[in-house]
From Swiss-Prot:
Keywords: Activator, Chromatin regulator, Developmental protein, Differentiation, DNA-binding, Nucleus, Spermatogenesis, Transcription, Transcription regulation. GO terms for cellular component: actin cytoskeleton; cytosol; nucleoplasm; nucleus. SMART domains: FH. Residues 52-83, 219-287 are annotated as: Disordered. This is Hepatocyte nuclear factor 3-gamma. InterPro entries: FH_FOXA3, Fork-head_N, Fork_head_dom, FOX_domain-containing, TF_fork_head_CS_1, TF_fork_head_CS_2, WH-like_DNA-bd_sf, WH_DNA-bd_sf. The gene is Foxa3. Restricted mainly to endoderm-derived tissues (lung, liver, stomach, and small intestine), also present additionally in ovary, testis, heart, and adipose tissue, but missing from lung.
Amino acid sequence: MLGSVKMEAHDLAEWSYYPEAGEVYSPVNPVPTMAPLNSYMTLNPLSSPYPPGGLQASPLPTGPLAPPAPTAPLGPTFPSLGTGGSTGGSASGYVAPGPGLVHGKEMAKGYRRPLAHAKPPYSYISLITMAIQQAPGKMLTLSEIYQWIMDLFPYYRENQQRWQNSIRHSLSFNDCFVKVARSPDKPGKGSYWALHPSSGNMFENGCYLRRQKRFKLEEKAKKGNSATSASRNGTAGSATSATTTAATAVTSPAQPQPTPSEPEAQSGDDVGGLDCASPPSSTPYFSGLELPGELKLDAPYNFNHPFSINNLMSEQTSTPSKLDVGFGGYGAESGEPGVYYQSLYSRSLLNAS
């Protein structure tokens, strides 16, 4: 009994001296994960905290393992890692970031000009209008306008020459500003500048950020429009008169003057003119006369042109007439109607063709 007991104890001692193969860790295999390790622990087998060597190593401890201390600082953005990461008994690898990480965006911003020194969103006309309206007498000199703008907006305290030139141009070229001479009781240098009485609706509801319309004096606009219209009318009138003169010269050529050696042609002209000028007297003569279809009377024509074909043909076929011309162009009713019929027949034939 005792021997067997001793042998069992001896066996236990041998088993404790010779560990099993599954519990021996060689330095070649990577370290398995068995407990919540720190995030800074490397898994490289060459830097394993276990001693190399083999069979004489003891079994793994059951408690948490402490990571080795970092060899180099991690950077300036993690100032709190020295205190949080040096404790070996921490079970979690999370470290709260420093105050610089929470507000890093604000720290990364560059320098910004304060709002008071920014350029105001007003035009020069708006600035001048504000300065004049804030004055007790509703008028200011040029230097007083400069001073008011610089006192209210610090942006205009720099580059004074540039924006002051713009102020002077705005005062001179805008009709909404009126130059007022100094009175004898207010001696000094420079005239006053005031707003035109009719420029009250220049801004929308008193908002100087946007101007409603450009103010212009109606008198200047009317004068400019009248001068332009007068010049246009003068040019058009001269062109019209020249055109009328040329048309008159073309449409009214010089009429030939009859010579004393042509009494027959002159009498023929008179007869043709009388015939053409008296169409109403032709109706009673031919009311009861039946004429062929080719010689029917046409509508009365008024050929008064000296070079018309009727007058030219009447000059060739005319015969000496004995008509009395004392009835004011109506023809002689008591004369012989042969010549009158002859001239009328020739005119009807020409019209029928």
